[in-house]
Amino acid sequence: MTAQANNTIYGFSANALDGSPVALRDFEGKVLLIVNTASQCGFTPQYQGLQALYNRFGDRGFTVLGFPCNQFGQQEPGGSGEIKNFCETRYGVTFPLFEKVEVNGPNAHPLFKFLTAASPGMAIPFLGGAEDIKWNFTKFLVDRQGKVVKRYGSIAKPDEIAADIEKLL
């Protein structure tokens, strides 16, 4: 059964920062916050808040999945090793990080095509249609059944999402 057929994220896979394939079905039964990230963005300090959510709720079946992306202002120019080092040393990130992906356009990772179709945002002139991700640190909350529950824009701080996570745990 395809991910689209059962309307969950579990049919997708992505490569971890070390290049190893990761099936999202490995996260089945967990509440997830899937985020497109960047190391040189004004929202980059949100890594700290994302890690705080992971620390707070991780033992209750929650995880953050970070997907670096260089599509917005070329704010993630580094390779996987640089990204890993930056996130771990600067923000103490221990949640799973994946290889750099595109989140919009014809080369968008299939997971992000699915996420944006399942939870469209607002259409904004010059920034794309309703399904397009507008900037770094857009967040998608996914329930324990692998269904997209809510989409949050870049300005939504991780601690503002805590109550929604709590409801799903």
From Swiss-Prot:
Gene3D superfamilies in the cross-refs: Glutaredoxin (3.40.30.10)
List of catalytic residues: 41
GO BP term, pick one: cellular response to oxidative stress
EC class: oxidoreductase
Described function: Hydroperoxy fatty acid reductase essential for the removal of lipid hydroperoxides under normal and stress conditions, leading to the protection of membrane integrity.
Protein activity control: Mercaptosuccinate, pCMB, and nethylmaleimide act as inhibitors of the catalytic activity.
Catalytic activity, reaction form: a hydroperoxy polyunsaturated fatty acid + NADPH + H(+) = a hydroxy polyunsaturated fatty acid + NADP(+) + H2O
Entry's pH dependence statement: Optimum pH is 8.2.
InterPro entries, alphabetized: Glutathione_peroxidase (IPR000889), GPX_AS (IPR029759), GPX_CS (IPR029760), Thioredoxin-like_sf (IPR036249), Thioredoxin_domain (IPR013766)
Subunit: Monomer.
Family indicated by similarity: Belongs to the glutathione peroxidase family.
EC identifiers of the protein: 1.11.1.22
Keywords: NADP, Oxidoreductase, Peroxidase
An annotated Gene Ontology molecular function: peroxidase activity
Description of what induces expression: High light, methylviologen, t-butyl hydroperoxide, and salt stress conditions increase the expression level.
Name assigned to this protein: Hydroperoxy fatty acid reductase gpx1
Gene name linked to the record: gpx1
Temperature profile: Optimum temperature is 37 degrees Celsius.
